C-alpha cells in the first residue's frame, strides 16, 4: 500500500492544534495530514475522567486509519509515543511507519511512567514533575498554571512568540491512563519502520532519557537530531516537516539503515540523520 496520510498525535495536556504550523508544510508535499485530539482532549467530550483505556483514548486516530485509502505514518510527540505504539500493535497493516518526536518509546511490556519517575540512571523527568500535580485520586494530572513563566520555559522553550501559545492548544487535565499502560507491541508491529526525532535541548525528556529508551527498545531505530527543546513544532516547523516528509517518502529505506542507539551515541549533524551502521 502507498503512504497517503500522515497523522500527528499530540502529547500530554496538548491538543492537535499544536501542529498548526506543520500541517500545511506537509500538505504541500502531497500528503493528507491529520492532527486530531485524542479522547479527553476536546472540550465537551467528557475530559480525562471519561478515558477508559488506550483503545478508547486513541479511538480518534483509529477512525482516521480506517478511512485512509492507503497506509499512514503516525507521529507521536512526548506522551504521544505511547499512543502510536498502541496503534501500531492493533492496526499494523494500516501503518507504514512510526515517528517518535522526543517521545516515549518504551520496550514492550514497559509503561511510560517507568521513564517519567526518577529511578535508575537515564530515567526521570524532574523538571516536568515539578510542574505537574495529580488530581482526582490519581486519575488526572494538572499543570501548575500559577507558574506560567516556568511552564513556558520547560515545556515551550521553543515558542517564538510573546507569552504563551494559544489556549486552544491545551487542556486543563490529562488522563493518567497512557502513563500506566504497558507498550503492547509484538510481532508485526515490531517490524514497522521507526524514526526517532531527538530534541537535543529538551529538559522535559532529556536527551539521555531519549537515548536510553532507544537503547532498550528491541530493534533498530533510525534517528534525526534537532537542536530544539521539547516543542520543535514551534521553533522549527520547516525542519520538522522536512524530517517527517523525508521519512514518509521512503520509510523502508530508513528501516534498512537504522541501528541501535544509546545514551552515549553521538548526535547527528545539526538536524541531520544519525542512523548509519558505522555509528558506535
From Swiss-Prot:
Keyword line: Hydrolase, Serine esterase
Record region (Disordered): 254-280
GO molecular function: methyl indole-3-acetate esterase activity; methyl jasmonate esterase activity; methyl salicylate esterase activity; trans-permethrin hydrolase activity
UniProt-listed InterPro entries: AB_hydrolase_1 (IPR000073), AB_hydrolase_fold (IPR029058), MES/HNL (IPR045889)
GO BP annotations listed: jasmonic acid metabolic process; salicylic acid metabolic process
Positions of disulphide bridges: none
Effect of pH on activity: Optimum pH is 7.5.
Active-site annotation: 202 (charge relay system), 230 (charge relay system)
EC number of this enzyme: 3.1.1.88
Role noted for this protein: Catalyzes the hydrolysis of pyrethroids pesticides. Catalyzes the hydrolysis of cypermethrin to equimolar amounts of cyano-3-phenoxybenzyl alcohol and 2,2-dimethyl-3-(2,2-dichlorovinyl)-cyclopropanecarboxylic acid. Hydrolyzes cis-permethrin at approximately equal rate to trans-permethrin.
Family: Belongs to the AB hydrolase superfamily.
Subunit structure: Monomer.
Protein name: Pyrethroid hydrolase
Amino acid at each position: 500500500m502507498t503512504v497517503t496520510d500522515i497523522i500527528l498525535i499530540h502529547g500530554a495536556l496538548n491538543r492537535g492544534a499544536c501542529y498548526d504550523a506543520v500541517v500545511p508544510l506537509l500538505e504541500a508535499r502531497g500528503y493528507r495530514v491529520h492532527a486530531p485530539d485524542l479522547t479527553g482532549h476536546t472540550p465537551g467530550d467528557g475530559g480525562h475522567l471519561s478515558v477508559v483505556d488506550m483503545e478508547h483514548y486513541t479511538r480518534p486516530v483509529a477512525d482516521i486509519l480506517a478511512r485512509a485509502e492507503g497506509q499512514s505514518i503516525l507521529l507521536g510527540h512526548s506522551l504521544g509515543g505511547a499512543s502510536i505504539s498502541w496503534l501500531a500493535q492493533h492496526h499494523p497493516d494500516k501503518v507504514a511507519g512510526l515517528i517518535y518526536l522526543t517521545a516515549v518509546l518504551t520496550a514492550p511490556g514497559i509503561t511510560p511512567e517507568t521513564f517519567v519517575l526518577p529511578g535508575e540512571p537515564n530515567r526521570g523527568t524532574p523538571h516536568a514533575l515539578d510542574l505537574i500535580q495529580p488530581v482526582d485520586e490519581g486519575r488526572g494530572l494538572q499543570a501548575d498554571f500559577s507558574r506560567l513563566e516556568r511552564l513556558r520555559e520547560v515545556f515551550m522553550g521553543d515558542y517564538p512568540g510573546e507569552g504563551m501559545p494559544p489556549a486552544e492548544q491545551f487542556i486543563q487535565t490529562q488522563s493518567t491512563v497512557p502513563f500506566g499502560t504497558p507498550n503492547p507491541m509484538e510481532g508485526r508491529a515490531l517490524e514497522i519502520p521507526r524514526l526517532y526525532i531527538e530534541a537535543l535541548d529538551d529538559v522535559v525528556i532529556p536527551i539521555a532519557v531519549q537515548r536510553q529508551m532507544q537503547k532498550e527498545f528491541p530493534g533498530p531505530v533510525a534517528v534525526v537530531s534537532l537542536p530544539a527543546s521539547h516543542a520543535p513544532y514551534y521553533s522549527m516547523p520547516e525542519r520538522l516537516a522536512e524530517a517527517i516528509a523525508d521519512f514518509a517518502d521512503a520509510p523502508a529505506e530508513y528501516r534498512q539503515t537504522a541501528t541501535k542507539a544509546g545514551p552515549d551515541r553521538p548526535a547527528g549533524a545539526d538536524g541531520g540523520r544519525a542512523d548509519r551502521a558505522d555509528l558506535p
